[in-house]
Amino acid sequence: MYDLTGKHVCYVADCGGIALETSKVLMTKNIAKLAILQSVENQPAIARLQSIKHSTQIFFWTFDVTMARQEMKKYFDEVMVQMDYIDVLINGATLCDERNIDATINTNLTGMMNTVATVLPYMDRKMGGSGGLIVNVTSVIGLDPSPVFCAYSASKFGVIGFTRSLADPLYYTQNGVAVMAVCCGPTKVFVDRELNAFLEYGQTFADRLRRAPCQSTAVCGQNIVTAIERSENGQIWIADKGGLELLTLHWYWHMADQFLSYMQSTDDENQEQFVSGQR
């Protein structure tokens, strides 16, 4: 179990919908500090959060997740002055706009990766940090394809690939930063907005989704925090239909283990065995 008591949490996402509900639950876990980085200031929401736990310090920065990494560094230098350190980084910024592929990819994937690359040095044990946990909030259509939201699905597949890659023991044993993901199923805040299919053939299905049964943001937020508390490095969870499921991960490439051993080996014989195994 991951104990959130006394932790310093940084949440990169709009303070509304799933992010707001997740933050509400975090505020009941006796965290010491909560930094919220979002594109638009939402003072009423922040006031609601502060009313839950007055002793928890809340900090806010207007933040564009698609900015260049050099600009991000300036923001997080300021964040660290207030936060001292970051125990938990939650990446929750998301966009589903099939008519704007660049914005969808930049928000959901590139921006998330740049955020992680910027924050990791502050957390890395070998660089003076204390280790910690990175939580990528993503979607179930990052696990299975969506014929309707193709660009969105592609970006979320990327989040899963990045999460699993960064969680490899190659990194975790060095930096002490665990990485996990929570894949949310259809949630009310998502289906309530106007949705466009990638191709016009899928628009009927996109329109129908607005009337489909889905989980509430409050239940989803609760399950995200529960997944964090149960987390281990490399885990992928599904938060859907009010429930929480830990995935059993599969390797589809049968040479994955051998290839990693080859990359880590300096022994010519071991390398020759790998080459022979590919034939």
UniProtKB/Swiss-Prot annotation:
Signal peptide: none annotated. It holds the Pfam family adh_short. InterPro entries: ADH-rel, NAD(P)-bd_dom_sf, Sc_DH/Rdtase_CS, SDR_fam. PROSITE patterns: ADH_SHORT (PS00061). The keyword S-adenosyl-L-methionine does not apply. The active site is at Y152 (proton acceptor). NAD(+) binds at residues 11-34. Substrate binds at S139. It comes from the Eukaryota. GO terms for cellular component: cytoplasm. Keywords: Oxidoreductase. One of its GO terms (molecular function) is oxidoreductase activity. Belongs to the short-chain dehydrogenases/reductases (SDR) family. This is Alcohol dehydrogenase-related 31 kDa protein. It comes from Drosophila subobscura (Fruit fly).
